[in-house]
C-alpha cells in the first residue's frame, strides 16, 4: 500500500511541477488559448496513450509504475479544472468564438494525442 501511495504522490508532484512550468513559461504568449495549459493536456494525452499501450504489452511490470505514470504523473500534469476556468473566463468576456475554439482544441487535441501515443507505442513495440 505504501509503495502505491508513494508512486502516485511522486508522479503527481512531477506532473504538477511540469504543468506549473509550462504555464509559467508559455501562458503569457497567448491569453485567448493559453499554450501552457494546452500543451500540458496534449502531452498528458500522449503520455497516457503510450503508457496504456506499453502496460498492455508488459503485464509483468510492477503495478506501481502504472500508478506513478498514469494516475500520478498524467493526473498531475493534465488540467481540466484550469482549462474549464479559462473557458469560463472567455465566456464571461463575451469571447464565444475563442471559448468554442479552446474547447475544440483541448478536447480533439487531447483525444488525438492519446491515439497517437497508443499507436506510436504499439509501433515501437512491434505490435
UniProtKB/Swiss-Prot annotation:
InterPro entries: FluC
MF terms (GO), sorted A to Z: fluoride channel activity; metal ion binding
Transmembrane segments: 4-24, 36-56, 68-88, 99-119
GO cellular component: a single term: plasma membrane
Superkingdom assignment: Bacteria
Catalytic activity from the UniProt record: fluoride(in) = fluoride(out)
Keyword terms of this UniProt record: Cell inner membrane, Cell membrane, Ion channel, Ion transport, Membrane, Metal-binding, Sodium, Transmembrane, Transmembrane helix, Transport
One GO term (biological process): cellular detoxification of fluoride
Residues noted as binding Na(+) in the record, renumbered to the chain: 75, 78
UniProt activity-regulation remark: Na(+) is not transported, but it plays an essential structural role and its presence is essential for fluoride channel function.
Localization terms from the record: Cell inner membrane
Entry membrane topology: Multi-pass membrane protein
Known role: Fluoride-specific ion channel. Important for reducing fluoride concentration in the cell, thus reducing its toxicity.
Family indicated by similarity: Belongs to the fluoride channel Fluc/FEX (TC 1.A.43) family.
Matches recorded under HAMAP family: FluC
The protein, known as: Fluoride-specific ion channel FluC
Lineage: Bacteria, Pseudomonadati, Pseudomonadota, Gammaproteobacteria, Pseudomonadales
